[in-house]
């Protein structure tokens, strides 16, 4: 019996030692997460995003971003394939393959699809489907996690590099890399600018905890989501920045330009990919607890909780409207566009199809 107790004691010491000292990939810092107010006020729960119609994307998954161009819908995907969808017939074809992990996408003035590819950098896809790299480095450092982009009136492409420490390709998946950046919270993300006139890339501003969705405002500033802090920033091309939304009820992902409001104001659509994690918020000031969590099996770590939420805001961050699905039936919605055909198309990190709903 004594031997059994000694054996159990030794095992307990091994487990304690493992949870306390085993090396992990992150070196977390303390911060203070704001109190999660939940779905109240402007975010009061509704079911207006429920029962989305689904458009087939074949055997790929994760239609991360969506654009409409000349009546056709284009979506990116986790495995690098770009699909062209006929929204009237619900048919699709492979338009291009980046051989990476295609995330954000916009159309430039020449009809090229500009892609933020987490593995490859900033790419251009010609109308013939030819893929070329615009940039994959800045100031001698690799662009490790190109995430989202928008194009200014002068043609400059502003795009996010979500993490310079946890590259999507080096870590293995976009999701795994994003979780490491958020758990560590040192803020290695940045906003970059690529000028196609002289093929130069520069850092606009850095220090973000997973810099994510990017959208151009009419005054030339850039709206950018910072996923790890539940914030939206308004950043000028010279790097001057201010927070226009704080303490969102979930993790903001993509942001896209929306239709003008009745009074002429600009609007933008933000996708909230997951509810906030109470455990992460409660342990925001406890780096050691987050280190211990990283030593646990992945199934025991904080998990994303799907809750469908698209938020429409004005350029100052005031909430205009929300579309919600508390059931999260369409999983991990990353964002949305309101297209010329009267539909709102909803993208996703993990769904096997593209969601849409007819707007009244």
Predicted stretch roles:
Residues 2-360:
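Sequence-structural signature of mature extracellular/luminal beta-sheet repeat domains
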